[in-house]
Swiss-Prot record:
Residues 74-101 form a coiled coil. Component of the exocyst complex involved in the docking of exocytic vesicles with fusion sites on the plasma membrane. InterPro entries: Sec10-like, Sec10_HB, Sec10_N. This is Exocyst complex component SEC10. The exocyst complex is composed of SEC3, SEC5, SEC6, SEC8, SEC10, SEC15, EXO70 and EXO84.
Length: 871
């Protein structure tokens, strides 16, 4: 510090208004202010010679407090307070001064506001007065302006009228007008425009002045008309010359001149008529190409009639024509926009209409006419290809006109293109006989062609329609349970139409197939059938020394036999479905408004071709094959190869169901009634096929059961009462034959039937055999050795059945095996045996019949010990 009574200058700087405390808080300022005095005390304390043990923290603190001198602090704080007091007084004085200044300025501001308010009011009053005066002046001047404008127009009309009368007088008196001629021949197009306007008005004036009372007026009118025609023709020639020279400035000038003369009607017509695209001889020669397109392009023709090709087919020459037309229209649009300006839209509109009428429509009709001569499929594919081609062509031009900004707000050109496109196709699409009728016939012909080979191969088998008759018989015998139900009514309606539809389809088939080809196929089929019939007799056991020969016959031999199903596959149905989808896609694109109705008709054709013809015929063949089986001639062999028809039919039904659900029904979300009809029709077809399949399987089970019965009838009574044990080494011949059949049945049926269908089929066959065997063994007397033979036979059956994996059958044949034990056990064990295992659930009458067939049944010992217990 500089003195004991004055504050250090560094602290004085912090006690001023411009930098008060220098950013320090009050506590920080006081600490900084006291720091110098505290440091002096600490330094003084450290210089003392204190004992070492007293230099700890407490000792130092105590020593400091003892040596602390408060006077420097008091003086410093007093000086600080003095400075703060002076600063406070200074601040208060400044505050009072500035407050007085603010009050004075507020008074002055208020006085100025009052004064300006008065001045503003005065100004507004003055403005209102001036506005009133101006309004009065406008009311006076406005009529004068209108009158002046009218006067100017009258003056101009007067001048024009005078000019017009003078020019008329020239023609009236001299038959010509030098002034008009000079204007016409001028190099300045605006003067040419003036001459045209004069002639336009002269034509009107001459028509009004023409009268028979003054013959010369008639002649004058003729002269003026002739001159006008000459002038217009010359302008048109100049226009054509300028077009050939690509002089667009000249073209624009002449177009403006003629537009003022007669609206540009003739120049527009001349521009279109004289266009090279319409008069070029090369273009005319190209028309002949469309007449011979199918003759020259054989590959294209093959594509059109190829069932397997489902892509959109576009004829090359038509594609080239459309590309050429599009290029011409785009190029001419640029020229027209520069030449005709405001009339450009109208000119392009006329040009487009002319192109469609002269270039497109004739070739369009020729192409369709020639395609129809090839086939219905070629016709509808050409029509669809043209629709696709012209759709892209129209959209491309519409986008181009929008980009070129040549189409006005009314979208005249877009509307014209769409109208031309619609007019081109409406004549065909909305006439049922020219499109959808042909589409239906095309699809019918395709389905006939795809199913014809299969149908012809099995013509003999399906001739009598035995399965369909069986189906009708099944319906008629279940009137109460079936016919009165909704499903029954559906099947009745379906059945009532199925026969007629199928007869129509067969008639259609006969008319569409080549007669020579048909007769050849039928001859071959009959020969094959004869050979098949002959070959089936090879399996007759009666002609063999032993039935064991037939036991070596396997399912692979049957698969390779001539009776194997042919030309019936999922691939064929898939191909047919693709054709149906193709027809549906065409209908959806060509006639979206009626698509829901036409899809229903297409699906009816599909069901007629695939279900009522293809599948029904296959099932008829399968039923015919099982019905023609002669159980007396085919001992040891059961050919179930016809089950392939059933397995394939099941897969086809699944495919049809999935296709209907995933492809066709989503298209009909907006047509719930049609959708419901299709669902009902689909369910009806599926239900009918299921019934037909069940009839075939039931007949198959019946035939197999009859076969088992016939084989069991060969059982000899002495088979189970042998005199020695010589025959214990082999099963009886009926058992061997039946086991062989069981193995063949399982091997074949497991190939064609799957899941529950296979299990149900095997269960029914096994139950039939079980019932037959249960009854069979109750009719034979059996001795103790014969009981072993019976057991061996049953073990053979049981082993074959266990391979099937059907639990219920395994239990039944286990029961049969336990029944065989009744022939072999000692009499005293019979009672306990019948109360154990499966025999506990068997009826007493069955057990009694088996026991009564024991050879020792009539012995006294047996009667005394057992017989009375089973009465």
């Amino acid at each position: 510090m500089n003195s004991l009574y004055e504050l250090d200058p560094k602290w004085k700087k912090l006690l001023k208004t411009d930098n008060f405390l220098g950013g320090l808080t009050v506590n920080e300022f006081v600490q900084e202010l006291s720091k110098d005095h505290r440091n002096d005390v600490l330094i003084d304390a450290n210089t003392k010679n204190l004992p070492t043990n007293e230099k700890d923290q407490d000792a130092i603190r105590e020593a400091i407090w003892k040596q602390l001198d408060p006077k420097p602090y008091i003086r410093t704080f007093e000086s600080t307070l003095k400075e703060l007091k002076n600063l406070n007084e200074e601040t208060l004085n400044k505050r009072q001064y500035f407050s007085e200044q603010v009050a004075t300025q507020e008074v002055i501001h208020s006085e100025n506001v009052i004064k300006l308010s008065k001045d503003l009011h005065t100004t507004l009053l003055t403005f209102d007065k001036l506005d009133d005066r101006l309004t009065n002046v406008t009311q006076v001047v406005s009529p004068l302006g209108d009158k002046l404008e009218t006067a100017i127009k009258k003056k101009q009309n007067y001048i024009q009228s005078v000019e017009l009368i003078r020019r008329y007088n020239d023609f009236y008196s001299m038959g010509k007008s030098d002034i008009v001629e000079q204007l016409r021949l001028s190099k300045n197009w605006k003067l040419n425009l003036k001459s045209v306007k004069l002639m336009k008005n002269l034509l009107i004036l001459s028509s009004k002045l023409e009268t028979s009372s003054i013959p010369k007026t008639i002649n004058t009118k003729l002269v003026i008309e002739k001159y006008s025609e000459m002038m217009e023709n010359e302008l048109l020639e100049n226009f054509n010359s300028a077009y050939r020279e690509n002089n667009f400035t000249k073209l624009n000038e002449i177009a403006i001149i003629l537009n003022n003369f007669n609206g540009g009607v003739n120049v527009i017509q001349s521009f279109i008529n004289q266009h090279d695209y319409f008069i070029d001889t090369k273009q005319i020669d190209l028309e002949n190409e469309f007449e011979n397109v199918f003759i020259k392009n054989v590959k294209f023709k093959e594509q059109l009639i190829d069932f397997e090709n489902h892509s959109v087919i576009i004829e090359t020459s038509m594609q080239n024509l459309i590309n050429d037309v599009e290029t011409v229209i785009k190029n001419e649009s640029k020229i027209v926009k520069r030449v005709f300006e405001e009339k450009a839209t109208h000119v392009i509109q006329l040009f487009i209409q002319r192109v469609f009428a002269q270039k497109i429509e004739p070739r369009f009709e020729v192409l369709l006419r020639n395609s129809l001569s090839i086939s219905n499929l070629a016709y509808v594919r050409i029509l669809h290809g043209l629709f696709t081609l012209f759709g892209k062509f129209t959209k491309s031009l519409i986008d181009y006109f929008q980009l070129l900004e040549i189409d006005d707000s009314n979208q005249i050109l877009s509307t014209t293109l769409e109208q031309c496109f619609a007019d081109l196709f409406s004549h065909y699409l909305y006439d049922r006989s020219k499109y959808f009728g042909i589409e239906k016939r095309s699809l019918e012909a395709i389905l006939v062609d795809m199913t014809s080979k299969f149908t012809v191969n099995y013509d003999k088998e399906i001739n009598k329609r035995v399965l369909l008759d069986k189906y009708k018989e099944k319906l008629s015998t279940n009137v109460d349970a079936f016919m009165h139900s909704p499903r029954g009514n559906t099947h009745s309606r379906q059945d009532s139409t199925s026969r007629s539809k199928l007869s129509q389809f067969n008639s259609f088939l006969k008319t569409h197939l080549d007669k020579d080809h048909l007769s050849l196929n039928r001859t071959n089929t009959l020969s094959d059938s004869f050979n098949n019939s002959s070959s089936s007799t090879q399996y007759d056991v009666a002609n063999n020394s032993s039935s064991l020969v037939n036991s070596s016959f396997t399912a692979s031999d049957i698969d390779n036999s001539p009776n194997s199903p042919a030309n019936y596959s999922l691939n064929d149905v898939d191909s047919m479905l693709k054709c149906v989808v193709e027809s549906t896609a065409r209908v959806m694109e060509l006639i979206p408004n009626k698509a829901h109705l036409y899809i229903l008709e297409i699906l009816k054709i599909m069901f007629l071709g695939i279900v009522d013809s293809y599948m029904e015929i296959a099932l008829e063949v399968a039923y015919w094959k099982i019905c023609k089986v002669d159980i007396n001639k085919t001992a040891g062999v059961v050919n179930l190869n016809f089950l392939k028809f059933i397995s394939m039919s099941t897969e086809i039904l699944d495919l049809l169901s999935i296709s209907i659900k995933s492809i066709f029904l989503p298209l009909l979300n907006n047509s719930p009634e049609i959708k419901a009809q299709i669902i009902e029709m689909t369910n009806s077809q599926i239900q009918k096929m299921e019934i037909l399949i069940n009839i075939i399987l039931q007949e198959t089970i019946t035939v197999i059961s009859t076969k088992f019965s016939a084989i069991l009838c060969k059982q000899k009574k002495k088979d189970f009462v042998p005199k020695s044990q010589e025959l214990l080494d082999q099963d009886t011949l009926p058992a061997i034959e039946i086991v062989n059949i069981l193995n063949l049945i399982f091997e074949q049926s497991s190939k064609f039937l799957k899941g529950k269908n296979l299990q149900t089929f095997l269960t029914l066959i096994g139950e039939e055999l079980y019932g037959l065997l249960l009854s069979h063994y109750s009719h034979f007397q059996v001795n103790s050795i014969g009981g072993v033979v019976v057991t061996k036979d049953i073990i053979g059956y049981q082993t074959a059945i266990e391979d099937w994996g059907v639990a219920s059958l395994i239990d039944k044949f286990a029961t049969l095996r336990e029944l065989a034990n009744l022939f072999t056990v000692q009499p005293e064990l019979l009672e306990s045996l019948t109360k154990e295992g499966h025999l506990a659930d068997i009826g007493r009458d069955i057990i009694q019949s088996y026991i009564s067939n024991r050879e020792d049944f009539n012995h006294d010992n047996f009667i005394n010990s057992v017989k009375l217990n089973f009465r």
